[in-house]
Design a protein with these regions (language model features):
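Iron-sulfur cluster-binding electron-transfer modules in prokaryotic oxidoreductases
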Residues: 1-195
Length: 195
């Protein structure tokens, strides 16, 4: 089963004792593994691990890196090759937690460029990034979450981009709910499966 890290429960009910207990259990398992670096795929998890684990006395003994930064570095070092998108014009959805917590904008663009995408920017990108909702919110308030995600698509429609690129599982789940006709949603990690 998937290790509970506390992020989903925190989004649902706040930073309660139950959330902190999940975080402590996760940190203990990571620390016991002896891992030198933890690569975190979901920015929601990365945010809570980076910001809250220390406050709650369950620090990680390892380094923490987002999956986008990790993959971009592998590509830069020539350790990972990607399939070519043949110049499709796309815009990157800057995950709001990566943007606001980690000020991380370049890794997703480096991955996209390596994968052969031509890039344009939506108005709300970088530090102006907007949320597209969360997987937890999609369960308990689906209509609102779909409207929030549709707002990101509206931003894309003001560009000439054919595709929206995301590198976050929660973003992909939410954005997939309202893909406009003629546009494509791309999980950027899917570009990593072939040369």
């Amino acid at each position: 089963s998937r290790m509970k890290r506390g992020a989903a429960l925190a989004d649902l009910m706040g930073y309660t004792a139950e959330v902190q207990a999940q975080a402590r259990k996760c940190a203990d398992a990571i620390n016991a593994s002896g891992a030198k670096t933890v690569v975190v795929l979901d920015s929601y998890d990365a945010e809570i691990m980076a910001q809250k684990y220390g406050e709650w006395g369950c620090e990680l003994s390892s380094g923490l890196v987002t999956a986008t930064a990790f993959v971009a570095k592998l590509i830069e070092d020539g350790l990972l090759t990607v399939r070519n998108a043949n110049g499709i014009l796309a815009a990157c959805h800057d995950d709001d937690r990566l943007a606001r917590t980690f000020h991380e904008f370049e890794p997703i663009r480096a991955i996209a460029k390596a994968a052969g995408y031509e890039l344009t920017e939506m108005f709300n990108h970088g530090k102006l990034a907007k949320s597209c909702g969360s997987a937890v919110a999609l369960v308990y308030m689906p209509e609102i979450t779909k409207k929030v995600a549709a707002g990101r698509w509206d931003d894309l429609l003001r560009t000439e981009a054919a595709a929206m690129l995301t590198a976050n599982p929660e973003s992909y789940i939410c954005l997939a709910e309202s893909v406009p006709e003629g546009k494509v949603l791309v999980d950027l990690y899917s570009a990593l499966d072939k040369e």
